């Protein structure tokens, strides 16, 4: 086991800066904080002809260990604004920080002759840093702004004993093996190509099969819960998003508009404005509510290039999106209905909710949130009461609401110990008003419906990333792109039966494949294991002679089983039905 000590890692960041200063005396140090897992330091070498390579990390790490062994203390000194400016007069990054904090206390920490602008805290001396590892080099921008200087960032970790570092490095290797980007590449599920554009995923045939199977399952869940499927345009008039409020509150995440003829259009970042148009397409009565709509839609949202991460953060995504239009007295029933729908979907996908967040607005942030205190109080209290009444444990998260209303977020803890929002239920009193939605109530008067946004699985891209990392790519049979591989012992003697068997399995909608390559049997079996194919069938003389039986082996098992073809198909059907 290991535990990160922020104070220790902050001190290790200073040790890294000391080592860097020795090897690169002309550099400008920027910032070096402790982070959730370790530390980093950002800096500018101030020399376009000099770079730092992974090999350089070894010598820097070696120097860090020498410095740590010297038991240098971390001595605090408070300085004035003028003193700080003088001490760091040749470092524009430190001067920027000093200027930002000129009306606050400023301090530096000394370690021997070296010092840095820092608030602390730190350990007593460097000898407490018993184990150090520099992990990688990355790029960053000063203040995280692409318009500012590009800096070099070195990440590292520090512990107070070697055993913790060793345990962490083992865990880190496991994470690399579970990284959905690596698994996706190994299993030919998806790819990216800069010629297509950054952050624009290309679903390969194997990945498309997984996506199709998930969508088929989710469509069935939506059908069971009485949702009607619609299809709306991938483009929308800018006026649509101005009416909804997205243009005012979400503009930075929307791709630039394009003018076509006399219209200004944008690639849609979400479907909710379109679904209000479906609702308003006909006159609604209180008796016809709730209206439940679903769509699996392609959306486009701008992400900075530095924020793009495999399938987790992309610029084009496929979102499973549901919207309910209901009467106020139906809110509780519809929210609970959404809860049940999400739970059923997560159970089928093997996903378990870690905790539930009630995401609220920040009343002080008038720019991010629609300014209607009464609406926020009403909607947030409605969700809060519902969660309490049904004894559903939750955490309140201020500042995490959508701009138009509060939401219930279903948080999933991945095997990599990351907390990710997969499913969501959002209560919205704003959009129905902005689009003048109405229904005829029991008094034959117009009333405004409530809109509930429901995301059962979120985006398919993020869901696939989670599934790959949870399963290490060993997907259940119903999701596996290739469910069975048929391998003849001899391509000449056994190919005909292998083809006949393949045709029969495919007739039963089993995703089987033939491996008729002129390769060693052991190599074919090994490659089937690498591809994580759930079932392998080896066809030889015995299978053909013995009433055309099949001998199969499950992925990860050395044990083989011989059964009739019909019985094997029953095994597959049972696994698929139970979503094993």
Curated annotation (Swiss-Prot):
GO terms for cellular component: cytoplasm. Its cofactor is Zn(2+). Zn(2+) binds at residues 272, 323, 453. Residues 179-476 are annotated as: Catalytic. InterPro entries: aa-tRNA-synt_IIb (IPR002314), aa-tRNA-synth_II (IPR006195), aa-tRNA-synth_II/BPL/LPL (IPR045864), Anticodon-bd (IPR004154), Anticodon-bd_dom_sf (IPR036621), Thr-tRNA-ligase_IIa (IPR002320), Thr/Ala-tRNA-synth_IIc_edit (IPR018163), ThrRS_anticodon (IPR047246). It comes from the Bacteria. The keyword tRNA-binding applies. Its main location: cytoplasm. GO terms for molecular function: ATP binding; metal ion binding; threonine-tRNA ligase activity; tRNA binding. Its EC number is 6.1.1.3. Catalyzes the attachment of threonine to tRNA(Thr) in a two-step reaction: L-threonine is first activated by ATP to form Thr-AMP and then transferred to the acceptor end of tRNA(Thr). Also edits incorrectly charged L-seryl-tRNA(Thr). Belongs to the class-II aminoacyl-tRNA synthetase family. This is Threonine--tRNA ligase. It comes from Ureaplasma urealyticum serovar 10 (strain ATCC 33699 / Western).
């Amino acid at each position: 086991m290991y535990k990160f000590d922020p104070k220790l890692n902050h001190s290790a960041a200073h040790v890294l800066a000391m080592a860097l200063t020795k090897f690169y005396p002309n550099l400008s140090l920027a910032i070096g904080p402790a982070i959730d897992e370790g530390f980093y330091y950002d800096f500018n070498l101030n020399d376009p002809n000099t770079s730092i390579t992974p090999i350089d990390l070894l010598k820097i790490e070696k120097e860090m260990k020498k410095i740590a062994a010297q038991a240098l203390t971390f001595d605090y000194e408070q300085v004035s604004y003028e003193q700080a400016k003088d001490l760091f007069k040749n470092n524009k990054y430190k001067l920027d920080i000093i200027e930002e904090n000129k009306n606050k206390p400023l301090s530096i920490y000394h370690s021997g002759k070296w010092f840095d602008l820092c608030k602390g805290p730190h350990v007593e001396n460097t000898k407490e840093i018993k184990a150090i590892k520099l992990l990688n080099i990355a790029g960053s921008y000063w203040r995280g702004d692409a318009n500012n200087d590009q800096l070099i960032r070195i990440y590292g970790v520090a512990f107070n004993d070697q055993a913790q570092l060793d345990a962490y490095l083992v865990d880190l290797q496991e994470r690399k093996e579970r990284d959905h980007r690596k698994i996706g590449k190994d299993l030919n599920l998806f790819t990216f190509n800069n010629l297509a554009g950054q952050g624009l995923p290309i679903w390969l045939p194997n990945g498309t099969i997984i996506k199709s199977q998930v969508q088929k399952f989710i469509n069935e869940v939506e059908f069971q819960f009485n949702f009607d499927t619609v299809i709306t345009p991938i483009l929308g008039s800018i006026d649509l998003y101005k009416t909804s409020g997205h243009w005012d509150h979400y503009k930075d995440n929307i791709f630039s508009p394009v003018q076509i003829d006399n219209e200004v259009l944008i690639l849609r970042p979400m479907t909710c404005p379109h679904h209000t148009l479906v609702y308003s397409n006909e006159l609604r009565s209180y008796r016809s509510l709730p209206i439940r709509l679903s769509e699996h839609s392609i959306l486009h949202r701008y992400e900075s290039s530095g924020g793009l991460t495999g399938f987790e953060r992309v610029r084009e995504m496929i979102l499973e999106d549901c919207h309910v239009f209901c009467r106020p007295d139906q809110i509780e029933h519809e929210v609970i209905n959404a809860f049940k729908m999400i739970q059923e979907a997560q159970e089928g996908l093997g996903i378990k909710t870690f905790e539930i967040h009630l995401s609220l607005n920040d009343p002080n942030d008038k720019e991010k949130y629609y300014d209607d205190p009464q609406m926020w109080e009403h909607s947030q209290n409605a969700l809060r009461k519902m969660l309490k009444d049904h004894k559903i444990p939750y955490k309140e998260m201020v500042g995490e609401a959508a701009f138009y209303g509060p939401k219930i977020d279903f948080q999933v803890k991945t095997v990599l110990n990351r907390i990710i929002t997969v499913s969501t239920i959002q209560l919205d009193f704003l959009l129905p008003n902005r689009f003048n939605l109405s229904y005829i109530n029991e008094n034959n008067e117009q009333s405004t419906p409530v809109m509930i946004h429901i995301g059962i699985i979120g985006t398919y891209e993020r869901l696939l990333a989670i599934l790959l990392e949870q399963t290490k790519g060993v997907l259940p049979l119903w999701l596996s792109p290739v469910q069975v591989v048929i391998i003849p012992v001899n391509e000449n003697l056994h190919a005909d039966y292998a083809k006949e068997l393949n045709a029969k399995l495919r007739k039963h909608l089993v995703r089987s494949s033939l491996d008729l390559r002129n390769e060693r049997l052991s190599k074919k079996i090994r490659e089937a294991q690498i591809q994580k194919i759930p079932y392998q069938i080896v066809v030889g003389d015995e299978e053909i002679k013995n009433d055309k039986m099949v001998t199969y082996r499950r992925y990860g098992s050395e044990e083989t089983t011989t059964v009739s073809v019909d019985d094997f198909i029953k095994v597959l059907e049972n696994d698929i039905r139970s979503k094993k």
